[in-house]
Amino acid sequence: MTLRVEKRGAVGWIVFDQPARRNAINGAMWRGIAPAMAQLDRDPEVRCVAFRGAGTEAFSAGADISEFESSRGSGESVGQYDGLLDQVLHSIQDSPKPSVAMICGFCLGGGLEIALACDLRYCAASAQFGIPAAKLGLAYNVEGHKRLLETVGHARTREIMFLGRRYNADEALAMGLVHRVVPDLESFTEQVLADLSANAPLSILNSKTIIEEYVKSSGAPDHARMEAAIERCAKSADYAEGRSAFMEKRRPQFKGR
């Protein structure tokens, strides 16, 4: 596994440590995040949690696509994978402790999902954001859509998901994907974490709880319809073509079936 969990004073750090692959998140890393969060949640000395990627090239380029054939190659395996992903994201969002994403370089796909599950997001000018699901024929999960909608709204979510393009740091700031773009990201984030650690934990938890309750959807989405759409995409020839094209380093030829 290439996930590091570190404790520095009152801050618990979770580090994606696979710089040769732009900190892509493999299966072992996904499975390690929720237990790491539980460990930090239980530690009374830890007041906040921070996520970062090793090096400066990437926070995380997303899920390790080299594993897609084995971990997401069928409708059933996609469902299992999405269940694991939901568990990971809820472990971050539902933590009683505030979380911060410190973003350098690429923050794509699953990496962006993790950042969106954090309470606060700060990035360097080098940061690039995006969700390339449409370029891979991939069915993006329900929780990922929900968090993106809550963060940037319906119009921006449509553009991000339909086009699959990348956005620079200033564009991400303008649409609300990040809270600030800062020149000295590490020292700025360290100061934010120091401020969080010094503030009253129960006061932060109170606000976190109230905010989460208010952003919950007041409607009743048709979950069966959403899951059917995911399954249809996961079983499609286009999804197989997207995976093959990525591994063969060519443009995919999607047929809509």
Regions found by a protein language model. Give the residues of each.
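Conserved CoA-thioester-binding segment of acyl-CoA-metabolizing enzymes
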Residues: M1-R52, H90
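Hydrophobic/aromatic residues within transmembrane alpha-helices
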Residues: I14, F51, D64, I114-L116, ...
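Glycine- (often His-adjacent) and acidic-residue-rich active-site loop
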Residues: E45, G53-S91, G137, S218
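CoA-thioester-processing core
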Residues: V88-D94, M102, L108-M161, A174-M175, ...
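C-terminal long alpha-helix characteristic of the crotonase
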Residues: Y122-A127, V178-A224, E231, K235-A237, ...
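Acidic, divalent-metal-coordinating active-site segment for phosphoryl/phosphodiester hydrolysis
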Residues: R165-E171
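Terminal low-complexity tails and localization/encapsulation signals of metabolic enzymes
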Residues: S244-R257
